[in-house]
């Protein structure tokens, strides 16, 4: 009775953990048998009560949490703001995903915490509440899904779906939510199946590695130990106790001079408590790592057996127990795949909140600006940062630990409880970080730009993978490549350095021409050496460089002759855009044709002048002949408007549908040559005409002599001698349409095609008719060039239109002579500029065109820019004037004076600007060539900006635009084509003519004025400004304008440069509209034209795919982010972690890649200590280090799951995978071959015996490799790759000593554990006899073996029962592999 009185009376609800504690205390107090009796009674009691209560669960018992509505609403609001930031390019996709997941996770967690108090207050006897919180059925997570919200689900890959399920199961799910939750549920079911098999396989491999480890000895005599220190802050007290209990001390422990524990004493709970209270020095304990042998273990190094609390028995198969202890929780835990919370939290960081309102102050030198995980700006502090918050009457000091983010700025006013800093979740948190790649794909097609320098990743110097050094935007500029059914082209400017990326219209990718196995060569033929050698200068000054670039034909890879090279001769302002034909059906080589865009040197087009032309290869002949237009001559009467002007020669456009070409073969021979055929004779094909030439066609020969030359024509065709009745017109020839037969002729046959009938009179009386075949050409629309140049993006009035015009290059009936082997173009398709003439067109209008170069980061883009302008000054063109001088004013020499012949009104009227813009983009990139077309959807116009006031002295406020007027008529300043000494003119409006010079005083400024400036510009980009009182500085390299603001400007103007990028919602001027995101391509006086672009944010370390300026299609990979994410905590993710650690896969998640660390330790230590010691100590230290970190990693996984596994089990396994070294190179000793895996101890012994260094380094084997590198080939063969293992063993003549369990099981022998263990000791005496016989037969080898194991015997001489081991080791010294 006395005992019972000591027990305390407990009056409280007992849950699972309390039950565990109760049972363990009962066992301590009463022992096993009595405890089980008590527990039986408890069980009976429980069942009785449950039967009486009979809890049932109905749908009404599921009470939803009232605060859910506003919590969800709040989270949605945050997500919306986030979405906006992502759209503006402030955060990138990974940050957005991470933050939105964290928002929802926090919401879900908050609801979950609300759940319990809510039940407790509203309905404490609720069945759901009773069941789940007593631990009977259902856990918090499941109840949370019933009454809170289901929250985030993961997809089959284990990635989070960032669309949370907001409803709970009580309210019911929407359709989308249902589908997403099916994802998660299906994953749960599949995982359970898959993971069970995974866990089983893991167990099998673990057992395989350690099956031969048995306790064979009481003490191995080791002097080493692992030190464990309670002071070290990294281990908690609980883990410290777990580590120590059941171990054996390796050293005496003193407190002061008093010894409280001696070596080889096993540690019980009492001793541990004393250690904790005394906080003694680090405690050195024996672990399986310190044991001397690799193939067995001794009792003291193993410690207590966890089953009965005493030292482990001899003959215990501890290896198998260890393997099963680690593998088994895996199989158990796979059943827990219900997705419980711990998903994707980035270790939700702790926050530091402000204690009171006030101003915050800290030292700014100690912090660095950075981005948080969510892309918010913050400051990072590297050391402890002291922050003071000054309120009205109180100062608070807050210390912020290192590596934290400060979320406020210096001197900022903070409110109480505002978050001022975020402490990084320390490394001690038990969630696993792993590196994940996330690809971001482009949403639209377009051209890629980036705004900072980008490094090539070192492995891919020539590839298209780049690394970003700092945070920057990637821009996808809209506008796609021109896709045509038959053509693809590339554009080369003079002297461009090109790469082999060419855009092919058929393939969607940038096709490498090397695909068709033709090596594409680039030849640069230049008429003069360009600059110094080695400088890659793009030189545009030479007027006639020839560049020939080798686009081989896709059809015949082997042919590389002249036609397959495109010779693009570039005059000063002419581009040729070559088309590329890829016609599979006609197996012939079609030479390239190209669109030529030509701009006159002064950049002025009149109406109806030709902007570009294209030679259609369908209207191309390589033989001579005659063109005829239709039979009716009236068609060739041309109306006045159809006059188009080309290179100052008018051409007539003939409105005909078809024309005819009559081929003939023409040879023009020198007068002296002897002709071998007669006039009017008929010859066949390939007849010799002169010594060198032969005829290509057969037919009638006509020979004429002209001016010292003989012209010889061969007409092919049929000859008819007409009867009396046939009247043939006396014309030179007529065309007869198909279907008309010869009248009254005997053979009235119909002609299928058009024919040309020509009358030939060889003599006066006789004549006959030659019927010649005719090639008919229908003039189709040709290639629709208008699609190349989309109409004006901004749909303005007064626009320049483009007409497509076909005209025939040769007149009616004119003979065409082809020089030998050249092609004759019959029809040319032209683009003609046209615009609506004003009715009262007093002055002539003209178009000013220029190639605009927009330069961003050394990538030059060419636009063609056209502006329709009334010519301000009527001009006369002098015949011999140089090209640039066409626009000189009547008295152009005096440039301070405006032209006096025009009144004020007249000038203002003539300078109203008609903006006609046809814009196309010529890409002049080094790497990929294409035309990019901007259509109206890709551009938008901003402007005009109103509201900048100039205050004059007369206090008149005159509204002007915030962009000062620049050059109203000739397009934007600074984009003059870079032509040598091209003088460009900038007109600025003057309201009253006032003479201005630099001595003017301010009181004269009664009117607003701007003045006319001349700039002279040479091709280097320098600007010579003859006018000293200019108020504009031009920086020629960036083409920026800096406006010097005068005193009368109230606000400064924004600097807008050509090629600048804007993000959305950036304000340019105070009153101006908000921008969309894009790149400025045209700056007008009062407005901008912006090419729309989408920004993608990329942070350092991201990989950019693709080249700068490359065309990307929708869905192409743009960037790859590598980011750390925390795996969700359930064991489904945990098990693969254990497996990765045990297999030592070099996955980034193994902290900083253990293998690399191992190599690092190996090298450094060897370097410090020199060769022989270096290898030994290097390997030892390396192995010790890696062992500790591996054990900690594996424990971390299991602890996070709440599974307790004793360290020694893990240590036994880790010992097996870290105890081998790799022989690195062959020294003098030929004992081991390089690349051989040997045990560390064996390497040391051999090194000592041979007194010579063996070079080796520590390696980490995975468990699979370790299983295949054991002492026993039978065990290896029964594991994996049976045939290979057995074959190798046979070739090497390996001997299996049957020491392990598995080999004996396979062969049916007695296994050497437990009672069978003693048998092994008796058997060993026979081994020693065999050993002696062998020594006699091979004295040298035996002697060497003696040396080898001599030191071993010294060690063991003091230990009883050492006879068995040493003899056996002697025998197996060299043979075991």
UniProtKB/Swiss-Prot annotation:
Binds 1 Zn(2+) ion per subunit. SUPFAM superfamilies: beta and beta-prime subunits of DNA dependent RNA-polymerase. HAMAP family: RNApol_bact_RpoC2 (MF_01324). In plastids the minimal PEP RNA polymerase catalytic core is composed of four subunits: alpha, beta, beta', and beta''. When a (nuclear-encoded) sigma factor is associated with the core the holoenzyme is formed, which can initiate transcription. Belongs to the RNA polymerase beta' chain family. RpoC2 subfamily. It is found in: Plastid, Chloroplast. Keywords: Chloroplast, DNA-directed RNA polymerase, Metal-binding, Nucleotidyltransferase, Plastid, Transcription, Transferase, Zinc. Zn(2+) binds at residues 220, 291, 298, 301. This is DNA-directed RNA polymerase subunit beta''. It comes from the Eukaryota. GO terms for cellular component: chloroplast; DNA-directed RNA polymerase complex; mitochondrion. InterPro entries: DNA-dir_RpoC2_beta_pp, RNA_pol_beta''_euk, RNA_pol_Rpb1_3_sf, RNA_pol_Rpb1_4, RNA_pol_Rpb1_5, Rpb1_funnel_sf. DNA-dependent RNA polymerase catalyzes the transcription of DNA into RNA using the four ribonucleoside triphosphates as substrates. It is an enzyme of class 2 (transferase). Its EC number is 2.7.7.6. It catalyses: RNA(n) + a ribonucleoside 5'-triphosphate = RNA(n+1) + diphosphate. Its main location: plastid. One of its GO terms (molecular function) is DNA binding. The keyword Nucleotidyltransferase applies. Its cofactor is Zn(2+). One of its GO terms (biological process) is DNA-templated transcription.
């Amino acid at each position: 009775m006395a005992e019972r009185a000591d027990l305390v009376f407990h009056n409280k609800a007992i849950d699972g953990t309390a039950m565990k504690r109760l049972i363990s205390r009962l066992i301590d107090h009463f022992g096993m048998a009595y405890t089980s009796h008590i527990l039986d009674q408890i069980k009976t009691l429980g069942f009785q009560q449950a039967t009486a209560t009979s809890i049932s669960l109905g749908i009404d018992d599921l009470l939803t949490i009232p605060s859910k509505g506003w919590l969800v609403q709040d989270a949605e609001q945050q997500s919306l703001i986030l979405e906006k930031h992502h759209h503006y390019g402030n955060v990138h996709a990974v940050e957005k995903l991470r933050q939105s997941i964290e928002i929802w996770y926090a919401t879900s967690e908050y609801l979950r915490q609300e759940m319990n108090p809510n039940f407790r207050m509203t309905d404490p006897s609720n069945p759901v509440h009773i069941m789940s919180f007593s631990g009977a059925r259902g856990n918090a997570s499941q109840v949370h899904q019933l009454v809170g919200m289901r929250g985030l689900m993961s997809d089959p890959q284990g990635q989070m779906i960032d669309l949370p399920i907001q409803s709970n199961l009580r309210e019911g799910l929407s359709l989308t939510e249902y589908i997403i939750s099916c994802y998660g549920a299906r994953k749960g079911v599949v995982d359970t199946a898959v993971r069970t098999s995974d866990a089983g396989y893991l167990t099998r491999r673990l057992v395989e590695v350690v099956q031969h480890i048995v306790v064979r000895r009481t003490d191995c005599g080791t002097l080493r130990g692992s030190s464990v220190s309670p002071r070290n802050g990294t281990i908690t007290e609980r883990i410290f106790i777990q580590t120590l209990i059941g171990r054996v001390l390796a050293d005496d422990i003193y407190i002061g001079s008093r010894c409280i524990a001696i070596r080889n004493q096993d540690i019980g709970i009492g001793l541990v408590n004393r250690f904790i209270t005394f906080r003694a020095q680090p405690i050195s304990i024996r672990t399986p790592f310190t044991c001397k042998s690799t193939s067995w273990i001794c009792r003291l190094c193993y410690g207590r057996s966890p089953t009965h609390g005493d030292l482990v028995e001899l003959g215990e198969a501890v290896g198998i127990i260890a393997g099963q202890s680690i593998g088994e929780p895996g199989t158990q835990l796979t059943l827990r795949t219900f997705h419980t919370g711990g998903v994707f939290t980035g270790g939700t960081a702790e926050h530091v909140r402000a204690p009171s309102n006030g101003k915050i102050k800290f030292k700014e030198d100690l912090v660095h600006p950075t981005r948080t995980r969510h892309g918010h700006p913050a400051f990072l502090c590297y050391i402890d940062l002291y922050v003071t918050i000054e309120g009205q009457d109180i100062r608070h000091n807050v210390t912020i630990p290192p590596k934290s983010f400060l979320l406020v700025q210096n001197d900022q006013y903070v409110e109480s409880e505002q978050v001022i800093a975020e402490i990084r979740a320390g490394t001690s948190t038990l969630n696993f970080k792993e590196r994940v790649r996330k690809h971001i794909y482009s949403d639209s097609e377009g051209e890629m730009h980036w705004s900072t320098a980008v490094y090539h990743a070192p492995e891919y110097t020539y590839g298209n993978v780049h690394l970003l050094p700092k945070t920057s935007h990637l821009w996808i500029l809209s506008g796609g490549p021109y896709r045509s059914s038959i053509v693809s082209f590339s554009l080369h400017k003079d002297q461009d350095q090109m790469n082999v990326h060419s855009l092919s219209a058929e393939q969607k990718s940038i096709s490498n021409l090397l695909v068709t196995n033709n090596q594409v060569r680039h030849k640069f033929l230049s008429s003069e050496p360009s600059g110094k050698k080695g400088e890659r200068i793009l030189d545009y000054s030479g007027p006639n460089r020839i560049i020939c670039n080798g686009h081989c034909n896709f059809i015949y890879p082997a042919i590389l002759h002249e036609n397959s090279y495109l010779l693009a001769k570039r005059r000063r302002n002419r581009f040729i855009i070559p088309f590329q034909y890829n016609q599979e059906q006609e197996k012939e080589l079609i030479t390239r044709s190209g669109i030529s865009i030509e701009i006159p040197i002064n950049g002025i087009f009149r109406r109806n002048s030709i902007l570009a032309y294209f030679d259609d290869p369908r209207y191309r002949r390589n033989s001579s002949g005659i063109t005829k237009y239709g039979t009716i001559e009236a068609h060739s009467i041309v109306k006045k408007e159809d006059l188009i002007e080309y290179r100052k020669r008018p051409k007539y456009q003939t409105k005909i549908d078809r024309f005819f070409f009559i081929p003939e073969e023409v040879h023009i021979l020198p007068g002296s040559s002897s002709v071998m055929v007669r006039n009017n004779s008929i010859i066949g094909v390939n007849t010799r005409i002169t010594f060198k030439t032969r005829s290509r066609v057969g037919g009638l020969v006509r020979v004429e002599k002209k001016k010292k030359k003989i012209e010889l024509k061969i007409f092919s065709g049929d000859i008819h001698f007409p009867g009396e009745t046939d009247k043939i017109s006396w014309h030179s020839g007529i065309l007869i349409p198909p279907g008309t037969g010869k009248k009254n002729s005997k053979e009235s046959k119909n002609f299928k095609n058009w024919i040309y009938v020509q009358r030939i009179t060889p003599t006066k009386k006789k004549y006959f008719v030659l019927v010649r075949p005719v090639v008919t050409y229908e003039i189709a629309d040709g290639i629709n060039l208008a699609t190349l140049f989309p109409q004006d993006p901004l749909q303005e009035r007064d626009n320049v239109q483009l007409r497509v015009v076909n005209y025939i290059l040769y007149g009616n009936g004119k003979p065409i002579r082809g020089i030998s082997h050249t092609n004759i173009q019959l029809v040319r398709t032209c683009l003609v500029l046209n615009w609506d003439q004003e009715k009262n067109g007093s002055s002539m209008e003209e178009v000013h065109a220029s190639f605009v170069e927009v330069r961003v980061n050394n990538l030059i883009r060419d636009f063609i820019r056209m502006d329709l302008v009334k010519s301000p000054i009527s001009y006369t063109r002098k015949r011999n004037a140089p090209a640039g001088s066409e626009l000189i004013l009547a008295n152009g020499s005096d440039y301070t004076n405006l032209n006096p012949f025009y009144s004020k009104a007249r000038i203002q009227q003539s300078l109203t600007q008609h903006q006609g813009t046809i814009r196309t983009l010529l890409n002049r990139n080094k790497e990929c060539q294409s035309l990019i077309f901007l259509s109206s959807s890709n551009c938008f116009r901003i402007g005009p900006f109103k509201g900048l006031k100039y205050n004059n002295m007369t206090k008149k406020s005159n509204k002007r635009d915030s962009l000062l007027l620049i050059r109203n008529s000739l397009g934007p300043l600074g984009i003059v084509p870079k032509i040598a000494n091209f003088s460009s003119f900038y007109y600025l409006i003057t309201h009253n003519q006032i003479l201005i010079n630099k001595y003017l005083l301010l009181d004269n400024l009664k009117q607003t004025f701007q003045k006319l400036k001349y700039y002279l510009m040479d091709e280097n980009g320098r600007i010579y400004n003859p006018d000293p009182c200019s108020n504009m500085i031009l920086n020629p390299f960036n083409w920026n304008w800096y406006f010097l603001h005068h005193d009368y400007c109230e606000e400064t103007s924004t600097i807008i440069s050509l090629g600048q990028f804007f993000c959305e919602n950036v304000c340019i001027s105070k009153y101006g509209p908000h921008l969309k995101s894009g790149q400025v391509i045209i700056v007008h006086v009062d407005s901008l034209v912006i090419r729309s672009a989408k920004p993608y944010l990329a942070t350092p370390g991201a990989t950019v795919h693709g080249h700068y300026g490359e065309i990307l299609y929708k869905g192409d990979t743009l960037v790859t982010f590598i980011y750390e994410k925390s795996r969700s905590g359930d064991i489904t993710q945990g098990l693969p972690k254990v497996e990765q650690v045990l297999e030592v896969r070099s996955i980034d998640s193994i902290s900083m890649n253990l293998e690399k660390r191992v190599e690092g330790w190996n090298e450094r230590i060897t370097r410090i200590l020199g060769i022989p010691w270096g290898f030994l100590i290097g390997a030892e230290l390396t192995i010790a280090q890696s062992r500790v970190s591996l054990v900690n990693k594996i424990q971390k996984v299991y602890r996070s799951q709440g599974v307790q596994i004793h360290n020694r089990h893990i240590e036994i396994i880790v010992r097996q995978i870290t105890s081998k070294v790799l022989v690195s190179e062959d020294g003098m000793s030929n004992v081991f071959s390089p690349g051989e895996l040997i045990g560390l101890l064996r390497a040391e012994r051999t090194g000592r015996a041979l007194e010579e260094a063996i070079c080796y380094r520590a390696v980490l084997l995975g468990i699979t490799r370790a299983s295949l590198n054991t002492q026993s080939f039978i065990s290896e063969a029964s594991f994996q790759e049976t045939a290979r293992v057995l074959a190798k063993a046979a070739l090497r003549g390996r001997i299996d000593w049957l020491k392990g369990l598995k080999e004996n099981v396979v062969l049916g022998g007695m296994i050497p554990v437990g009672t069978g263990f003693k048998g092994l000791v008796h058997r060993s005496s026979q081994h020693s006899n065999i050993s002696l016989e062998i020594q006699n037969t091979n004295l040298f080898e035996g002697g060497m073996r003696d040396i080898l194991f001599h030191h071993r015997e010294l060690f063991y001489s003091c230990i009883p029962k050492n006879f068995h081991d040493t003899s056996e080791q002697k025998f197996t010294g060299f043979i075991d592999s």
